[in-house]
Amino acid sequence: MAARAPVHLRGFIARVALNKKNLHARHKLDTDIDKYYYTLHNVIIPDFMDMVKEIPGYPERIKKCVAHTTPSYFEGWAFSTELIYKTVADKQHQTERNLEKCRIIRALMDMSYAMAGILDDYVDKGEFRRGKKVWASVCEGGQEAAIYDSIAVTYLMSLMVKRHFGTDPGYSKLIELFNMVPGTAAIGNTLDILDRHDTNYYDDTMWKHSVQNKAANTVFPAATAGLIHAGVLCDDLLDRTSEVFGYTGHLFQVWDDFMEHYAVKEQSGKGAPDTKYNAKTWATLTAMAHFNEAQAKEFKACYGSTDPAKRSRVRELYDEVNLRGLYIDYLRNTYMVVEEKISKIPDPRIQSACRSYMDWLLVEPPQDEEEAESVLNN
């Protein structure tokens, strides 16, 4: 099947570059979000509390930690778990219990990102996540205790997977995926820190390895876990699906890099740690590839500074090389590559789920906006 060329990119991560409000719009099929939160607060958290019930006061701490931190990103991202499962699993497999288990996977994946986020906030000295103060700033014991909380919750997650999936055929594969998220996030973020000392903004070698680990390899497990829960254990199908959703991890990271400069803090839900700590990002590497000599020199003099005037000048330099347009080009090119990957998956149901997620991410406008545009065009 030939790759489709989208006429318009109006999806979730394209909106900020199109001067549209950065709506956190859900996938059109993500209609049971109330059940997601019910599972998080009435199944997972009580199970966690039960696991540590012998320790005075600790169950309540775990409850507060999870409730405050999870999800740490827009929970619509991890809909890939449910989308894959509901599209691929046979209808007779989709019992109420198996649907609940699917939501457990989704919420635990979000929790895994949240625990990695606690460590990330410590390294970046972050103050806010999703518009809320970070856990370390509100919990008893402060930063030191918060770090141990992240380790403890990650351990409880493994017990939760065993409790609910321990007898399933795909249990060992699920455990591997849940271990992958904190492990590869640690690798990627370490590379990210080390790369801050290298001011050669023309070399993207380390950045590619960092993003592969901290973004791609942490995002695709949510989708792959949904496929395993659907009963697909074929390594070839799992690998192909993982590759497709690995690209979504890259896209989320590039979107995050772009958002730091083209979204207000109220939209992004955080500050600007990349600029402050001289981090190499998609934005810096792409802009440097298009700067002339004078622009490159000025950029190096301004980037990494806390001076508001210099930070403002960085944004102006990005505008001079039309970083918005370069961002849209990157999204479009990535979409074409991923579409080709999807077309080679030898299972039409998996193809359908992958394509549906990518179209939400890049192509389809939010339903409310689509309806408004329809009225205006008629």
Curated annotation (Swiss-Prot):
Q: What EC number(s) does its UniProt record assign?
A: 2.5.1.-
Q: Which domain of life is it from?
A: Eukaryota
| The entry's keywords | Isoprene biosynthesis, Magnesium, Metal-binding, Transferase
Provide the residue positions that the database annotates as binding Mg(2+) 2. Answer: D120, D124
Residues given in the record as Mg(2+) 1 binding sites: D120, D124
Cysteine disulfide links = none
Q: Return the broad EC class.
A: transferase
Q: Does the keyword Magnesium apply?
A: yes
Q: Where is this motif: DDXXD motif?
A: 120-124
Q: Which GO terms describe its cellular component?
A: cytoplasm
> What is the reported tissue distribution?
Highly expressed in male epidermal tissue associated with the cuticle of ventral sternites.
What role does it play? Sesquiterpene alcohol synthase that catalyzes the formation of the pheromone precursor (Z)-alpha-bisabolene from (2Z,6E)-farnesyl diphosphate.
Name of the protein described by the UniProt record: IDS-type sesquiterpene synthase
**Protein species of origin:** Nezara viridula (Southern green stink bug)
Protein's gene: TPS
